[in-house]
Amino acid sequence: MKPIILAILDGWGYSNKRGGNPILEAQKPNFDAIQSKYPMALLQASGLAVGLNWGEFGNSEVGHLSLGAGRVIEQYSTRIDHAIKNGTLNSNSVLVEALQHPTVHFIGLLTAGNVHASFEHIIALLDIAKTSGVHTFLHLFTDGKDSGLQEGLSLVKKLPQAPTTLIGRDFGMDRDNNWDLTKQAYELIAHAQGEKTEDFIFALQRCYDAGITDSKIPAFASSSYEGIQDGDALLFFNFREDSIRQLYNSFKDNSFKYSMTKYTDDDNLFLFGPPEIQNTLTGVVSMMKKRQLHIAETLK
């Protein structure tokens, strides 16, 4: 059997419209030769075709899963959306357990996108916690990558309660072993080590005026926040695992640690488990006793 390569070109797409289309305008003789010489087909990479809601942009995570499975897999974000709409999130046993604690810290990305987390999920969790009479702290990472560069300000204004801490996603969601960045997010959430503020909107605007975009916002903490206390529960609400895992693993001493999805193999306190997918591409190749080499990067 000849070697076969499955190469995924991140950000590569097809359109016959020339406006804003660098791929069509570029000189790419090798790609053009392959395309003209061999059979070609186009795949949908967003919305229902990859298990997302109608009209929702795709991303690398859902694209890779769909290619590897060879079928449509309902994504975490869609499953959580359905649970919110039909009310089953309220009775989720892990969430109910987390809300038995008098104080819960919600931790994750504040975004208008739907790649790593969802703004609607934050609102739903806060609403359920309020109904349960639980005191909540809100630790948020401003986005700037899957949302606009300075969209965090408008999102903070839409929140039903003020953040407890705020820091850019470059710190809270590093996945490239830059532990000096992760440490800043950890110290902010765990020990309130950041610039104290009474007004997060003013703090964000000051950063914007200095040319700082959302992903690089420095650490801010509410003036009244004193850090995580004994008996507090933590609930990480990002549904995409890879970008939050590094910070999540930093909270080693907290036994009341919950997550929206299964971040590590040792987790058992997660709200939504991974789907059971049989007969994947790599699984079938493995059953055929063929050798495989998988190459990817931790940072795009």
Segments the model singles out, each with a brief description of its role:
Residues 1-5, 12-171, 177-180, 184, ...:
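Active-site nucleophile/metal-coordination loop of metallo-enzymes that catalyze phosphate/sulfate
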Residues 3, 232-234:
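Residue-level detector of short, conserved catalytic/binding motifs and their immediate flanks
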Residues 8, 235-238:
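Structured core elements
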Residues 12, 241-242:
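Short glycine-rich anion-binding loops that position phosphate/pyrophosphate groups of nucleotides
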Residues 147-229, 236, 242-244, 252-257, ...:
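Long, well-ordered, tryptophan-enriched scaffold segments
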Residues 243-246, 283:
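Conserved structural scaffold segments of CAZyme catalytic domains across common CAZy folds
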